[in-house]
Swiss-Prot record:
Keywords: RNA-binding. Residues 73-83 have a biased composition (Basic and acidic residues). PANTHER family: HETEROGENEOUS NUCLEAR RIBONUCLEOPROTEIN 87F-RELATED (PTHR48027). The keyword RNA-binding applies. Residues 73-101 are annotated as: Disordered. Residues 84-101 have a biased composition (Gly residues). Residues 2-79 form the RRM domain. It comes from Synechocystis sp. (strain ATCC 27184 / PCC 6803 / Kazusa). This is Putative RNA-binding protein RbpA. GO terms for molecular function: RNA binding.
Length: 101
């Protein structure tokens, strides 16, 4: 399982997030996505702890807590959805009949 951490300060680092979550257990991984074009932090991240019980304790303690001047949103991360499905933009044209000419 992974934890979603939202409403993060744009100044936060992986080390900052690791330090906060280390109070609840052994941090396996921290991920802070950045904007592809600007390289700037996107204001959210993901943290993975060693055990589910540690993650549950961290979620309960930190959801709504103020940190770096912001109220954190902390919950179980949802599995990433496949972006290729759904509405295609012009890619699925239907052909009715034969040649245009």
């Amino acid at each position: 399982m992974s934890i979603y951490v939202g409403n993060l300060s744009y100044d936060v680092s992986e080390a900052d997030l690791t330090a906060v979550f280390a109070e609840y257990g052994s941090v396996k991984r921290v991920q802070l996505p950045t904007d592809r074009e600007t390289g700037r932090m996107r204001g959210f991240g993901f943290v993975e702890l060693e055990a589910d019980a540690e993650e549950t304790a961290a979620i309960e303690a930190l959801d709504g807590a103020e940190w770096m001047g912001r109220d954190l949103k902390v919950n179980k991360a949802k599995p990433r959805e496949n972006r290729s499905g759904g509405g295609s933009f012009g890619g699925g044209r239907k052909s009715y009949g034969g040649s245009r000419y």
